[in-house]
Amino acid sequence: MAQPDSSSLAEVLDRVLDKGVVVDVWARISLVGIEILTVEARVVAASVDTFLHYAEEIAKIEQAELTAGAEAPEPAPEA
């Protein structure tokens, strides 16, 4: 059995930390229509630099949405 190439493993790890990986899980277990267990999880693997970059971009998007919502005129009341 051949050993995995350690340089390729290092390249994969470098790419995962550079780009980041998100695993989003949602599962519900029910028995006879009765919910027994619900699992919600989000796992993020990335370098701190990558995380901070994307967190900054997400904050900009959220701020733009809040600003757009505040500037939207209120609907006229119905008569």
Curated annotation (Swiss-Prot):
Gene Ontology terms for molecular function: structural molecule activity
Disulphide connectivity of cysteines: none
Keywords: Gas vesicle, Plasmid
Region feature (Alpha helix 2): 48-67
Descriptive protein name: Gas vesicle protein A2
UniProt keyword Acyltransferase, yes or no: no
Subunit structure: The gas vesicle shell is 2 nm thick and consists of a single layer of this protein. It forms helical ribs nearly perpendicular to the long axis of the vesicle.
Stretch list, region Beta-strand 1: 23-31
Stated role: Gas vesicles are hollow, gas filled proteinaceous nanostructures found in several microbial planktonic microorganisms. They allow positioning of halobacteria at the optimal depth for growth in the poorly aerated shallow brine pools of their habitat. GvpA forms the gas vesicle shell. This protein can replace the p-gvpA gene in the p-vac locus and increases the critical collapse pressure (CCP) of hybrid gas vesicles from 0.66 MPa to 0.90 MPa. In stationary phase gas vesicles about 30 times more GvpA1 is found than GvpA2.
Gene Ontology cellular component list: gas vesicle shell; vesicle membrane
Region named Beta turn: 32-34
Stated induction or repression of this protein's expression: Transcription is activated by c-GvpE. Poorly expressed at mid-log phase. In 'wild-type' cells (probably NRC-1/NRL) gas vesicles are seen at all stages of growth; in standing cultures, cells float. In this study gvpA2 (c-vac) was not detectably transcribed, presumably most to all gas vesicles are derived from the p-vac locus. If the p-vac locus is deleted gvpA2 is transcribed in late log phase and rises in stationary phase; gas vesicles appear during early stationary phase, but fewer vesicles are detected.
Family assignment from sequence similarity: Belongs to the gas vesicle GvpA family.
Any Pfam family hit: Gas_vesicle
Something else known: Encoded in a 14-gene locus called c-vac which produces cylindrical gas vesicles only in the stationary growth phase. This 'chromosomal' gene (c-vac, gvpA2) is only expressed during the stationary phase of growth, while the plasmid encoded gene (p-vac, gvpA1) is transcribed constitutively throughout the growth cycle.
